[in-house]
A protein has these predicted regions:
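Charge-rich, low-complexity N-terminal segments
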Residues: 7-17, 22-101
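Short, flexible domain-boundary/linker segments around small modular repeats
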Residues: 30-47, 103-118, 166-170, 182-183
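The feature represents the first ordered module of a protein
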Residues: 73-136
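Mixed-charge, glycine-accented linear interaction segment located at domain edges/termini
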Residues: 146-185
Length: 185
């Protein structure tokens, strides 16, 4: 005969297994969602002046390319948006810590923690002939995430969006990291 302590131990192990199985199921769904989007992006069209759209019903990914070839591309803009009235819960601290392969580290410039909004920029930015070049990543739970590269000309006092050269491998890694993070909702 089992004692009350043994029964409680067995119940707690059963519930912890159910909780773990639920988490593992959610993790598998998130991974499958990210892999589905990445496969759509890999299929293209990898053509100059094209926009690649991919969606899994929860997330919509847009990649705007100025040019591309078999090795790399000129990325104009990357966006990840929620669909069906969903919102994204993206951790800017994770991005600041993990996305370090763009040549310039991204740092949080502004954050409204209560609203889940954040602005990250290259820090330090690249300076060249009176022009400052930097990445800008904007996070808004309702609007999604956008990554752009800008050039600010101090003499003109204006900034313009500029394409950034990336290898396909770097772009795929960036997309995989951001889609995976956005899929954790």
């Amino acid at each position: 005969m089992l004692s009350n302590g043994s029964i409680m131990f067995m119940k707690s192990r059963l519930f912890s297994k159910r909780g773990r199985a639920g988490r593992e199921g959610r993790n598998r769904k998130m991974i499958a969602s990210a892999e589905n989007i990445m496969e759509q992006v890999r299929r293209g069209p990898w053509e100059p002046n094209k926009q690649i759209l991919a969606s899994d019903g929860i997330l919509e990914v847009r990649v705007q390319l100025a040019d591309c070839d078999r090795l790399g591309c000129l990325l104009e803009k990357l966006e990840i948006r929620p669909t069906h009235g969903c919102s994204l819960n993206i951790d800017p601290l994770w991005i600041e810590k993990e996305i370090h392969y763009l040549g310039e580290p991204l740092k949080i410039i502004e954050m409204e923690k209560s609203q889940g909004k954040a602005l990250l920029r290259s820090f330090p930015p690249r300076r060249e002939n009176g022009t400052v070049h930097f990445f800008e990543l904007v996070i808004d739970p309702g609007e999604g995430l956008s990554l752009n590269r800008f050039s600010y000309d101090r003499s003109l006092g204006s900034r313009t969006q500029t394409p950034v050269p990336l290898t396909r491998e770097t772009l795929e890694r960036l997309l995989a990291d951001l889609v995976s993070l956005a899929s954790k909702n």
